[in-house]
């Protein structure tokens, strides 16, 4: 028989030690004590992947909240070429159980969708969801954009490069903050994947890096990074944090022992109650800017 403490340790090892983060590995920690959380799928465009799932905020005993709740829009990772919102349903459920409305969008993937089109998809989803959050019990003054890995890269571009939301007739000011989990923000185009994903005219490499779009008006930010990440170099987080501080933008950093899955893995049910990462993200989301 595996005792709960032993199981928690095994799953923490699985989540923290993976060099490549998969939804199977991360979702495994949610097979225990699963709970049904209401989910609604919404189309934000006509494309087959232009959909997002909404999870309604719940109180401490699993009932829908009756007061406006903070909103988290979570963008999944997958190296810009894989991943699906349903594979991260456990993140949506975790956020709902923390008392947040969770919105998980899909977006176009490589190779059929190229940069910057997949960022345009997420910007469109953000604007669409932000305009409707009150329908699901959301508080429009507290809408935080969060992403993991490649999803953090895409979300950061939407948060910092105002051109994306401008195409949707709005601005990053509709958001109350950005949370980046193990994200790529300032990288070299030194792999086949990166060169293929961001191929194009010379200015495309500049436009692909969120760090280039930090200004004094950028959103307050919380960055989480595994100290031993081998998938995304930790210098990405250090560089973005330095740029934000130089611009005098409020920024918090959480550095934890572990690799690429340790940041988003904090939302796994087996980890959630003891996770300093989850506690600090929840406090950040609940805060009024």
Label every model-predicted segment:
Residues 22-64:
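N-terminal cap/lid segment of alpha/beta-hydrolase-fold proteins
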Residues 47, 183-213, 219:
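Mobile cap/lid helix-loop segments that gate and shape the active-site cleft of serine hydrolases
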Residues 66-78:
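Short beta-strand element of the alpha/beta-hydrolase
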Residues 86-104:
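Short amphipathic alpha-helix adjacent to the substrate-entry channel of hydrolases
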Residues 113-133:
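Alpha/beta-hydrolase active-site loop
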Residues 127-193, 205-206:
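Primarily recognizes the serine-hydrolase "nucleophile elbow" in alpha/beta-hydrolase
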Residues 217, 223-225, 229:
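Short beta-strand/loop motif that positions the catalytic acidic residue
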